[in-house]
Amino acid sequence: MNAHNAALGGTPQRLKRGIPLALRGVARRFGEREVLKDIDLLVPAGQFVAIVGRSGCGKSTLLRLLAGLDQPSRGELLAGSAALAEAREDTRLMFQDSRLLPWKRVIDNVGLGLRGDWRAKARQALRAVGLAERANEWPAALSGGQKQRVALARALIHEPRLLLLDEPLGALDALTRIEMQQLIEGLWREHGFTVLLVTHDVSEAVAVADRVILIEDGEIGLDLPVELPRPRSRGSARLAALEAEVLNRVLAQPELPPQPEPVSPLPTQLRWAL
């Protein structure tokens, strides 16, 4: 079994360390409004970070900067000592919408953009997310949770070192959401990539992350380590206390108007839809 196959379908291996991230004085302005204000942040390789905050606080803007879908007004985005732009091939982004192409079968969506003999790898990626038997079906036959599993398989086939998650579970029912949280956490523990998850769900953040970052009016208002053993018991008093600490801070902040959505060049938009 080769290294790629082992990563997706065989004995768990941490084949690649995640990407270490450094943000230095990162800001983003839209007209007169500064959505992000001189963000300084260090994320060690392989850490699972959840980013929470009220609508309009700047958390999705931050993820777009990390994905290369937008550019900062000032500041630096680094992967280790190099520019983050140099790590684009090792970075994948998942959205709330699975963005599957309805005219392509499931396996073809997973292998989208790949060349050569990719079908075996695509099947292994589908096996890793529990959908090997749905490979030849159309996306229309899948539930919302299954579509997100396909989107996750599409990311896994590229062996990402940095996985960016922009509310990927927001449209799912509660039970499916928990199942997907457990799947993502399990794959992260197996492969060791760095994860940044943007979510409105504070309970989700403290359940899966090593660290919860609260964005308040474009600044880091809280940086909370979640030092609890895994797998975590969702009914535990410690988890509830951490959730309450974050929620109390979030609820103390006023709701902000949504920031404008920047339009990236078409090739970049297409790249992250794949």
Swiss-Prot record:
ATP binds at residues 53-60. Belongs to the ABC transporter superfamily. Aliphatic sulfonates importer (TC 3.A.1.17.2) family. The gene is ssuB2. It is a peripheral membrane protein. PROSITE patterns: ABC_TRANSPORTER_1, ABC_TRANSPORTER_2, SSUB. It comes from Pseudomonas aeruginosa (strain UCBPP-PA14). Pfam families: ABC_tran. CDD domains: ABC_NrtD_SsuB_transporters. It catalyses: ATP + H2O + aliphatic sulfonate-[sulfonate-binding protein]Side 1 = ADP + phosphate + aliphatic sulfonateSide 2 + [sulfonate-binding protein]Side 1. This is Aliphatic sulfonates import ATP-binding protein SsuB 2.
